[in-house]
Amino acid sequence: MKKAILSVSNKTGIVEFAKALTQLNYELYSTGGTKRILDEANVPVRSVSDLTHFPEIMDGRVKTLHPAVHGGILADRNKPQHLNELSEQHIDLIDMVVVNLYPFQQTVANPDVTMDEAIENIDIGGPTMLRAAAKNYKHVTTIVHPADYHEVLTRLRNDSLDESYRQSLMIKVFEHTAEYDEAIVRFFKGDKETLRYGENPQQSAYFVRTSNAKHTIAGAKQLHGKQLSYNNIKDADATLALVKKFDTPAAVAVKHMNPCGVGIGDTIEQAFQHAYEADSQSIFGGIVALNRAVTPELAEQLHSIFLEVIIAPKFTDEALDILKQKKNVRLLEIDMTIDSNEEEFVSVSGGYLVQDKDNYVVPKEEMKVVTEVAPTDEQWEAMLLGWKVVPSVKSNAIILSNNKQTVGIGAGQMNRVGAAKIALERAIEINDHVALVSDGFFPMGDTVELAAQHGIKAIIQPGGSIKDQDSIDMANKHGIAMVVTGTRHFKH
């Protein structure tokens, strides 16, 4: 029987994963809180102490730091000497290590964190097990991200958990532990940047870089301009997150954490022109992100309007010469790599909330046409564009889009009809090719009726209301094509 050690701080999916492992004939060993959760779920699991024959001591500081654990992980199965030594010492082989670390980054992100709290959240045993298992990836499967549970189980079931895949998991482990160590170094070095002020002049603020992630705002290379302000950083982060969703050339403009214009095109110049035309008034003083290099032609377009920050993966030398004529504009060069395992957290009174970032995009084949009329190809393109954008808009959110740009955005309203009114009234165009996109379901048919009054012929929304049929009936009454996705995208 194969053996697996499970010790996780992020309990997402661990019960289901552990149950599946037992069905695949794995014997499970665990520690502390992870074992308690598995015990409560009636998952067969033994204590790591049953391997080490040594109790957890020092409030759990020493649990897995033992030859019985690390010998079983590090043994080279192809070396008889290693196997003989294990046998002599009565040590069992460990075939899988599932570990994620104490939440150091989240802990120190709290501005009121104490030194003792920070120190207690420095994981020792976890990184040691991860690094040992990753080193021996030819024989041991190492999982650090819950997002990998599903594929590991699939590969175990179809016997495709090969060395190449285990190596890919190994790389994730060393990336994770490197970022973890970097966060510790940054915290104790006091790596924080004092900002002029916070959201308003009466608020003090500073920027703490908690990891060495080169594809984030924290790791951006500033090529020109004044120091980034608190609001610049927040807006730039929102802009970057949205532009990364696009594979085709794309441009995103953001004001006050909401996109005001999003455009795509065959070239990055076309994409920016579409984003600019989407709302040429609101883009003034905004943040713009582009997912292609800034060319001289594009630089001339950008230079012609007032922007606070311009973000791109690269600026040509000539483009920089043009843009640097404005001494205050901030130019940020950023790796546009997407990290599917990113988390986000927000402080609340007495604590903070942590969640995975809302990066999920429903595949078109999983969306469902619920009306008598089906969308045209152009309407589908408009819907899919808008569906990428709407998670970045404050709820309640309604977007109008065609197949190349947003044409109207209603953000942050207390009711869905109000958001729709704003989007429809501000729309630069409405025709049969424009789609209305909603981040949440319609509680009744009034939003669809309002859309029909303005000539909308295609709607995409999550569905899920007990009165879904009212909206569907209203769409059918007006010959509107409606698609439901089954996934909402609230943003608070």
Swiss-Prot record:
Assigned EC number: 2.1.2.3, 3.5.4.10
A biological process from GO: 'de novo' IMP biosynthetic process
Entry's Gene Ontology cellular component terms: cytosol
Keyword terms, alphabetized: Hydrolase, Multifunctional enzyme, Purine biosynthesis, Transferase
Pfam families membership: AICARFT_IMPCHas, MGS
Reaction(s) catalysed by this chain's protein: (6R)-10-formyltetrahydrofolate + 5-amino-1-(5-phospho-beta-D-ribosyl)imidazole-4-carboxamide = 5-formamido-1-(5-phospho-D-ribosyl)imidazole-4-carboxamide + (6S)-5,6,7,8-tetrahydrofolate; IMP + H2O = 5-formamido-1-(5-phospho-D-ribosyl)imidazole-4-carboxamide
Domain MGS-like per the UniProt entry, residue ranges: 1-144
UniProt superkingdom: Bacteria
Domain notes: The IMP cyclohydrolase activity resides in the N-terminal region.
Family: Belongs to the PurH family.
Protein name in the entry: Bifunctional purine biosynthesis protein PurH
Lineage, top ranks: Bacteria, Bacillati, Bacillota, Bacilli, Bacillales
Gene: purH
